[in-house]
Each structure stands twice: as structure tokens, then as C-alpha cells.
Design a protein with these regions (language model features):
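Pyridoxal 5′-phosphate
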Residues: 1-214
């Protein structure tokens, strides 16, 4: 957030509770006249809690602001519905739940937002090497320099695997392993699980709070 402030962007941070659950009332009250964009993590990389993207997307639509969802921890593990969540942008990395190589990722943009954005990185001018500036058409205007083709091919293979196995199957396996881990951790003294216990509202990321350690 600090880097955005350095560029003159006004940032409002909406709190979550100890388990990582978003305070919806605080979120609704956080909008200002100049609010343009809401950015939210779909699943916490600390406690595994999944935030209610559908509800947040509905509120953003009512307020008339763009909604960007960071799905780094959820893509490939739980289903994401671009339209149902009213997303303007979906950001994800390839090397986590999507099982792809490091250095890969994706940014899915709704047309209205893509048209409103200017390239933030330039170099090589992408597919239009004869130009002195980045192309103005999609997706080339956001693809500076040489693409990571080996990584993209590897990510494509991972996506094919996920499609073949099924996200629901992957989530069920992750759920079983995490549940077993949590059950055994619960037997230990002075150790608490951080995050919600409802498996409809979390992924397999599990963090621990050791009461004997400050």
C-alpha cells in the first residue's frame, strides 16, 4: 500500500477479525466519493480463510467501482466465477494452486478496465517492434519484452492436469490432509490453529499460534 501512496493514491484498509474474516459492515462504510477500485485477497496466505468474493463483488457493483481479486492462494483449489463475483480483474500466480512453474501468472481483465489502464512496464514494444511505444491493443499493451514461453507451456500443462483431475477432487484431497494435520495439532498443548474451521470458508493453508512464544 505504501508504494501506491507514494504515487498519490489514497488507500483505505478494511479490517478482518483474528480468523481473517472480512468485516462486511466496515467494508460497506469504507467507500468514499472518490473510491475507484476494491482489491481483495480471495484466500489468506496466512490463515487460509476464504473471503466472500461474491458478496464483495455485489457491493462493488452497487457502488459502481472496479473489483480486483487476488487469487494467488485459491486458483486451482476452489472454483472462481468471474461473472458471478462481478470481477473487473483476476490476478493469480502459476506456481501455487495451479501447480505451474515459478515466474508464471495471469491477469484477467474485463474489457472496461483493460481499456482504462495504461501499460506500467515497457520494453521491446511486444508484437509491434517497429514502434517506439507499447501497442495500445490487448493483450499486447501489457506484454512488454519477450514472453516466458517455457513457463507458459509448463503452466498450460498444469492447467490441463487440473482440468483432467477436477478442482473439486483437488480441494477434497487438500481438505483431508489439512484436517488430519489440524486434528493432530489440536492434541498438542499451548498450540492454537489460526483461521476458521468451516471448510466451506477456507483452503488448506494452516498457521499456528504457539502460546509459549511471544
Amino acid at each position: 500500500c505504501q508504494s501506491l501512496k507514494d504515487f498519490g493514491v489514497e488507500v483505505t484498509i478494511v479490517p478482518c477479525d483474528r480468523d481473517g474474516v472480512l468485516d462486511i459492515d466496515a467494508f460497506k462504510n469504507s467507500f468514499k466519493e472518490n473510491t475507484k477500485l476494491v482489491v481483495m485477497s480471495h484466500a489468506s496466505n496466512v490463515c487460509g480463510t476464504v473471503l466472500d468474493a461474491e458478496e464483495v463483488g455485489k457491493i462493488c457493483k452497487e457502488k459502481g467501482v472496479f473489483f480486483a481479486l487476488d487469487a494467488a492462494q485459491s486458483a486451482g483449489v476452489i472454483n472462481i466465477d468471474f461473472e458471478k463475483f462481478n470481477l473487473s480483474a483476476l490476478c493469480l500466480t502459476g506456481h501455487k494452486g495451479l501447480l505451474g512453474p515459478q515466474g508464471t501468472g495471469a491477469l484477467l481483465l474485463r474489457h472496461e478496465l483493460a481499456e482504462a489502464l495504461d501499460p506500467v512496464i515497457s520494453g521491446g514494444t511486444g508484437s509491434a517492434s517497429h514502434l517506439l511505444t507499447m501497442p495500445e491493443f490487448m493483450p499486447d499493451k501489457f506484454e512488454a519484452g519477450t514472453l516466458n514461453l517455457p513457463g507458459i507451456i509448463g503452466l498450460n500443462a498444469s492447467l490441463e492436469y487440473i482440468r483432467r483431475v477436477g478442482i473439486d477432487t483437488i480441494f477434497e484431497t487438500e481438505k483431508q490432509l489439512a484436517q488430519l494435520f489440524i486434528e493432530e495439532i489440536d492434541k498438542l498443548p499451548n498450540v492454537k490453529i489460526i483461521g476458521v474451521r468451516d471448510w466451506n470458508k477456507r483452503v488448506g493453508t494452516v498457521s499456528l499460534d504457539f502460546e509459549s512464544i511471544d
